[in-house]
Amino acid sequence: MKHSYFISDLHLSETQPELTALFVDFMQNLAPQAERLYILGDLFDFWIGDDEQSTLIQQVKDLIKSVSEQGVQCYFQHGNRDFLIGERFAKDTGVQLFPDYQLITLYDKKILLCHGDTLCIDDVAYQQFRRRVHQKWLQRLFLCLPLKVRLKIAEKIRAKSNQDKQAKTQEIMDINQAFTTEKVQEFGVNLLIHGHTHREAIHQQAGFTRIVLGDWRKNYASILKIDESGEFGFIKD
């Protein structure tokens, strides 16, 4: 039966080879069987520019390109860790880049996709930071810096982010229900899929279904499957 996959929040890095191994297995064995593959952000733990080269980056690019060349339509939506992924990455892999909110039609069903961080409006400090780093002039300036400098800046930002999380409640870092409902109504859908919060779940809410993609861990890959009959669910071992 025809089907598509949705993944997010893999946070791939050279310090966690077990996550890369899970991704390799998925891309070599499951992904080629799908019609479409949607990656909803934070594929990488951080991204400092399309010009960065590493063994991991090349491996991931090659895997996505291979799946794309096998006829799978691949899509990428930026996360809060890899929002600097650009057109060069898209060209190298064959993915189509999505904006922050993307409306798709899959098997006659309208679905709203987003990474999920834009729904967490109660985290005021993060939203202020997000607005700053998404300014195009600042991004252009950052990308003009030497790679080593960019890497140091990214490491400092990541460390501060991890520190700040310790002082925030789970409620603040979760989506705002009222705002999320407004977004769903704005786009006129009854199915929303997002990641970011790392809380894999399928929520039946008033008037719509909200599917939250989980983060990938040492022994678990969070993979959502939707087939042409309209059935959906997370793949379990």
Curated annotation (Swiss-Prot):
Domain of life (superkingdom): Bacteria
Compartment annotation: Cell inner membrane
Membrane protein topology class: Peripheral membrane protein
Residues the entry annotates as binding Mn(2+) 2: D42, N80, H115, H196
Keywords for the protein's UniProt record, in alphabetical order: Cell inner membrane, Cell membrane, Hydrolase, Lipid A biosynthesis, Lipid biosynthesis, Lipid metabolism, Manganese, Membrane, Metal-binding
Name used for this protein in its record: UDP-2,3-diacylglucosamine hydrolase
GO CC entries: cytoplasm; extrinsic component of plasma membrane
Binding site for substrate: N80, R81, D123, S161, K165, K168, H196
Gene: lpxH
Organism whose genome encodes this protein: Haemophilus influenzae (strain PittEE)
Keyword Transmembrane attributed: no
Cofactor info, note text: Binds 2 Mn(2+) ions per subunit in a binuclear metal center.
Keyword Metal-binding on entry: yes
Functional pathway: Glycolipid biosynthesis; lipid IV(A) biosynthesis; lipid IV(A) from (3R)-3-hydroxytetradecanoyl-[acyl-carrier-protein] and UDP-N-acetyl-alpha-D-glucosamine: step 4/6
Cofactor(s) for this UniProt protein: Mn(2+)
Enzyme class, first EC level, given as a word: hydrolase
Gene3D superfamilies named in the record: 3.60.21.10
EC number: 3.6.1.54
A UniProt-annotated Pfam family: Metallophos
GO biological process, one term: lipid A biosynthetic process
Positions with a binding annotation for Mn(2+) 1: D9, H11, D42, H198
Role, per record: Hydrolyzes the pyrophosphate bond of UDP-2,3-diacylglucosamine to yield 2,3-diacylglucosamine 1-phosphate (lipid X) and UMP by catalyzing the attack of water at the alpha-P atom. Involved in the biosynthesis of lipid A, a phosphorylated glycolipid that anchors the lipopolysaccharide to the outer membrane of the cell.
